[in-house]
Amino acid sequence: MTNPLSDASSRVGSGLRIGVLALQGDFREHIHAVEAAGATGVGIRRPSELDDIDGLIIPGGESTTIDKLSRIFEVRDPLQKRIAEGLPVYGSCAGMILLADEIADPATDLDGNPQQTFGGLDITVRRNAFGRQRESFETDLDFKGLDFSAGESGVDPVHAVFIRGPWVERVGSGVEVLAQVDPDHASHTATLHGVARIVAVRSGQLLATSFHPEVTGEKRVHELFIRMIRGEA
């Protein structure tokens, strides 16, 4: 297999300043991932910090908690504005949920109000679709858009880790499907019901995955995002 941590990939982010929403979740791992690609990674907690970044990552964690804290720290509205203005954003796991325009099974607060998202991606997601923590699993995925990493034998699959991950149940006409979990995946045949489930999508400058590339050391998804920021993908 080719090594995703090639010299070229370690320089692709040079000169870029990429923010990672650092309210909750595995934001540190994402900062390390973009820095491994040569970019400057910065934690984002305040509205003013959104002004000086080239792109933003919304990490995995608890989507309801990130939503709540984004209001407390008053970054929700400015972030939605930046997304509408075209800021490149990548969301992993909970980040995918928060970028979705619709949640099929939203959590509710004590008053019965459904959780909200930042939106931007014309998709419907289902939370914890693959099950709870004990149903976490790993698998290899064919992932579109990684041609820049092709070796003599083509593009290696992406090794993906799913931890209480969502899946996408609907995509709008402007959304490209990048990866799906095989319906015959051994550990989730009953859950998948014979349907290939969408776990990675892109629409314009927005990218989202159900899984956590920052956990496995798989840098190509972050490299794809960086190339999107540069207008090279």
From Swiss-Prot:
Known pathway: Cofactor biosynthesis; pyridoxal 5'-phosphate biosynthesis
Question: For binding L-glutamine, which residues are annotated in this chain's numbering?
Answer: G61, E62, S63, R127, I163, R164
Q: Which reaction does it catalyse?
A: aldehydo-D-ribose 5-phosphate + D-glyceraldehyde 3-phosphate + L-glutamine = pyridoxal 5'-phosphate + L-glutamate + phosphate + 3 H2O + H(+); L-glutamine + H2O = L-glutamate + NH4(+)
Q: What is its EC number?
A: 4.3.3.6, 3.5.1.2
Q: Which GO terms describe its cellular component?
A: cytosol; glutaminase complex
Which residues are responsible for catalysis?
C93, H212, E214
Q: Which InterPro entries match?
A: Class_I_gatase-like, PdxT/SNO, PdxT/SNO_CS
Query: Pfam families attached here?
Result: SNO
* Gene3D superfamilies, alphabetized: 3.40.50.880
Matches recorded under SUPFAM superfamilies: Class I glutamine amidotransferase-like
| Gene Ontology MF annotations | glutaminase activity; pyridoxal 5'-phosphate synthase (glutamine hydrolysing) activity
Query: Which biological process terms from the Gene Ontology are attached to this UniProt entry?
Result: glutamine catabolic process; pyridoxal phosphate biosynthetic process; pyridoxine metabolic process
Keyword Hydrolase assigned to the entry: answer is yes
Q: Which family does it belong to?
A: Belongs to the glutaminase PdxT/SNO family.
Q: What does this protein do?
A: Catalyzes the hydrolysis of glutamine to glutamate and ammonia as part of the biosynthesis of pyridoxal 5'-phosphate. The resulting ammonia molecule is channeled to the active site of PdxS.
Instruction: Return the protein name.
Output: Pyridoxal 5'-phosphate synthase subunit PdxT
Question: What taxonomic lineage is listed for the species of origin?
Answer: Bacteria, Bacillati, Actinomycetota, Actinomycetes, Micrococcales
Q: Gene symbol?
A: pdxT
